[in-house]
Amino acid sequence: MYQELIRNELTEAASVLQAFLADEQNLKDIEAAAKLLADSFKQEGKVLSCGNGGSHCDAMHFAEELTGRYRENRPGYAGIAISDPSHLSCVSNDFGYDYVFSRYVEAVGRRGDVLLGISTSGNSGNILKAIEAAHAKGMKVIALTGKDGGKMAGLADVEIRVPHFGYADRIQEVHIKVIHILIQLVEKEMAK
């Protein structure tokens, strides 16, 4: 009854991934982002990650893979998802939701740290403010975006963009693949 829908969904997902894979610059950007992360960890830096909705979950997943493990046992790496409910509710109430990530970056970000900002549209106001705060602190910025990169286009040290203009879930599906590859590459870089 739903097999055609299922096939169409999987076909579209494969098509979006294939289009992303066909652009060699995406592979170079993933490698550059992984090296940027590993360089920070080698200097005892940390990565702060943030996103909204499903991208928030991806930011948490990324941090968890760093502090925990991916495929193999190894030392934990300093990854913090900006996701503490008391912080989010305090800043939302006192300053507004656009500041939930930037206030955290201002509080704990340091020169040599990295911000990973995830936004499928590239237009999330709170991610844009977090990027601004990260730059002010001397941090490096990696952005996972979609569509045309939105307002985040050109603001990061490394932007990894999924140029899909349909629903956000297709962009998120590629983002999670990128996150897993970043972890794998960081592990290889740290083992050198």
Swiss-Prot record:
Binding-site positions, Zn(2+): H61, E65, Q172, H180
Chief location category: cytoplasm
Keywords annotated in UniProt: Carbohydrate metabolism, Cytoplasm, Isomerase, Metal-binding, Zinc
Pathway note: Carbohydrate biosynthesis; D-glycero-D-manno-heptose 7-phosphate biosynthesis; D-glycero-alpha-D-manno-heptose 7-phosphate and D-glycero-beta-D-manno-heptose 7-phosphate from sedoheptulose 7-phosphate: step 1/1
Intracellular or extracellular location(s): Cytoplasm
Catalytic activity: 2 D-sedoheptulose 7-phosphate = D-glycero-alpha-D-manno-heptose 7-phosphate + D-glycero-beta-D-manno-heptose 7-phosphate
Occurrences of domain SIS (ranges): 37-192
GO biological process, one term: D-glycero-D-manno-heptose 7-phosphate biosynthetic process
Entry annotated with the keyword Ribosomal protein: no
Binding of substrate, residues: N52, G53, G54, E65, N93, D94, S119, T120, S121, S124, Q172
Oligomer status and interactors: Homotetramer.
Function of the molecule: Catalyzes the isomerization of sedoheptulose 7-phosphate in D-glycero-D-manno-heptose 7-phosphate.
Miscellaneous comment: The reaction produces a racemic mixture of D-glycero-alpha-D-manno-heptose 7-phosphate and D-glycero-beta-D-manno-heptose 7-phosphate.
Name of the featured protein: Phosphoheptose isomerase
Species this protein is from: Aeromonas hydrophila subsp. hydrophila (strain ATCC 7966 / DSM 30187 / BCRC 13018 / CCUG 14551 / JCM 1027 / KCTC 2358 / NCIMB 9240 / NCTC 8049)
Lineage: Bacteria, Pseudomonadati, Pseudomonadota, Gammaproteobacteria, Aeromonadales
